[in-house]
């Protein structure tokens, strides 16, 4: 044992063991994830216990309870052979974020813009109790009667035309964008008129309550249009949080609007529409089962339509607004595996999916959506020598969010973060570098180098910026949640791989953004 233990200690940085990887278990097997290469390996029980000690306590034990010296020697030999053959557990502690040169960044902003999102209005006809724009949510604007002018909308479309590559998306946001349907329609028509020789697509998110047969017919008739439709499940669950500005539930209007759109799109509804469901606490199997049964019971809703199910935004719902109607009675909401409990939605969806055979079921879609990031993770033969900037996009390249006054933000989720330009002067390269590269890199790199999930991280600017720039206290809280979620995704992925490998084969067809 001492021979292989000594070799391992001489080769890897035991003191920084917490950054080298993590271990996780499914119902049937034990695994390790290697930070440097992105590889995942199945482990024997003894190897698992050694690696768990390394990753969680930064120690390589000389003895393990219940394990003989010979068995421990064999386990260390196996680990050493993997270190040699697969180059695992060998991460440099001082990596730097990949950074575009000024010239590359300038070219991406000028010639490769992918999406422009227009905030048509700050007004909404609803007052969802979990909405980030409610007065009790700091760091975000409140609802207001502000609306985008035609001049701003026109300039935003021209900016999209002039700074995009072979394809570009024009999207609409609010408030509720259908409050300004005539402006939305005028903007779509103008976009189709001036953007030629490119693949042009459109999209908007809606609470569905303002959809009429006429609006649905127009929307469905726009080539390249897609709709993100917000509905939270059956009437009791939906109306607990999604209420009109006067406090009345919105379910009846929302379900009617959804039906109008499905009828207008016809066969194309399954690929042109996405259902977005927000789940609020308490997170019970009773509530999640009710949501599942509701969507599966709508005979007119295409089974193949993508249905997303996710948590309410962090800190956006007040304790006094929480509805306890679907609290359940202590039933299963997350499976515990070696001391790690899968989060409520993930644990519930995984358990239900493993019980079902239908690859088009509601839970199958949720599980597949959460597995794409693990499936497409960065994998290398030898440890990577750099770091991606977590889940952050290249500011001003992936998308630009145009506020009602014409200012550019990174996206619709960044709240009161520093702007990056406007429709009159274009993207501001210096602001982008100052706030979203220099400051982010300087304040984040040390912590990222210490984190085993750094190459799987989905955390982006939206989670950690305020008016003056990055908020590291907020970011570090969100980091913990992301690590937790990432381990859950690893468990789900390898659980499905063990029991329903055909699902993993189909993931290549799932879009990854």
Predicted regions and their residues:
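A broadly conserved sequence feature marking short terminus-proximal activation segments
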Residues: 77-100, 391, 396-430
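Short, charged low-complexity linear segments at domain edges
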Residues: 92-112, 374-382, 417-442, 453
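Flexible mid-to-C-terminal extensions adjoining Fe-S/redox cofactors in radical SAM and related proteins
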Residues: 4-7, 12-20, 407-408, 413-513
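Short acidic, hydrophobic short linear motifs in intrinsically disordered regions
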Residues: 50, 57-70
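Radical SAM/AdoMet-radical enzyme domain recognition
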Residues: 153-171, 180-312
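N-terminal [4Fe-4S]-dependent radical SAM core
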Residues: 3-42, 71-117
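Conserved alpha-helical substructure of the radical SAM core
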Residues: 70-78, 93, 97-217, 222-225
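Radical SAM enzyme [4Fe-4S]-AdoMet core and its adjacent flexible, acidic
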Residues: 239-255, 259, 263-391, 395, ...
């Amino acid at each position: 044992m001492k021979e292989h233990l000594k070799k391992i200690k001489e080769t890897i940085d035991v003191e920084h063991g917490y950054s080298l990887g993590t271990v996780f278990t499914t119902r049937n097997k034990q695994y390790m994830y290697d930070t440097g290469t992105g590889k995942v390996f199945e482990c024997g029980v003894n190897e698992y216990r050694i690696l768990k000690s390394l990753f969680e306590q930064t120690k390589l034990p000389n003895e393990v309870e219940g394990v003989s010296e010979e068995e421990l020697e064999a386990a260390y030999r196996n680990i050493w052979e993997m270190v040699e053959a697969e180059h695992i557990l060998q991460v440099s502690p001082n990596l730097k974020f990949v950074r575009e040169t000024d010239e590359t960044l300038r070219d991406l902003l000028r010639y490769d813009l992918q999406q422009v999102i227009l905030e048509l209005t700050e007004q909404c006809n609803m007052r969802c109790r979990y909405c980030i724009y409610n007065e009790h949510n700091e760091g975000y604007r409140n609802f207001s009667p502000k609306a985008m002018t035609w001049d701003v909308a026109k300039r935003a479309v021209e900016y999209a035309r002039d700074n995009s590559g072979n394809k570009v998306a024009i999207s609409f946001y609010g408030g509720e964008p259908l409050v300004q349907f005539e402006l939305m329609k005028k903007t779509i028509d103008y976009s189709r008129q001036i953007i030629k020789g490119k693949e042009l697509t459109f999209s908007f998110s809606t609470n569905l309550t303002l959809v009429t047969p006429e609006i649905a017919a127009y929307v469905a008739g726009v080539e390249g249009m897609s709709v993100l439709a917000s509905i939270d499940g059956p009437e009791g669950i939906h109306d607990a949080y999604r209420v009109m500005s006067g406090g009345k539930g919105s379910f009846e209007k929302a379900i009617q609007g959804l039906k109008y759109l499905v009828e207008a799109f016809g066969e194309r509804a399954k690929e042109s529409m996405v259902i977005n469901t927000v789940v609020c606490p308490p997170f019970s199997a009773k509530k999640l089962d009710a949501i599942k049964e509701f969507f599966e019971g709508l005979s007119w809703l295409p089974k193949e339509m993508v249905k997303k199910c996710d948590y309410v935004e962090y800190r956006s719902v007040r304790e006094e607004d929480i509805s306890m109607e679907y609290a359940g009675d202590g039933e299963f909401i997350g499976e515990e595996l070696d001391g790690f409990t899968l989060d409520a939605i993930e644990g519930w969806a995984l358990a239900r999916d493993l019980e079902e055979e239908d690859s088009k079921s509601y839970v199958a879609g949720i599980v597949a959506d959460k597995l794409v990031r693990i499936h497409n993770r960065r994998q290398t033969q030898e440890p990577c020598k750099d770091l991606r900037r977590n889940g952050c996009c290249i500011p001003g390249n992936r998308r630009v969010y145009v506020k009602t006054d014409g200012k550019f933000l990174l996206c619709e989720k960044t709240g009161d973060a520093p702007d990056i330009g406007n429709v009159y002067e274009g993207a501001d390269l210096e602001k982008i570098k100052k706030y979203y590269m220099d400051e982010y890199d300087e304040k984040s790199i040390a912590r990222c180098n210490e984190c085993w999930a750094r190459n799987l991280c989905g955390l982006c600017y939206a989670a950690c910026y305020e008016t003056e720039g990055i908020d590291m206290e907020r970011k570090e809280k969100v980091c913990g949640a992301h690590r937790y979620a990432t381990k859950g995704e690893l468990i789900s992925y390898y659980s499905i791989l063990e029991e329903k490998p055909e699902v993993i084969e189909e993931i290549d067809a799932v879009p990854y953004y």
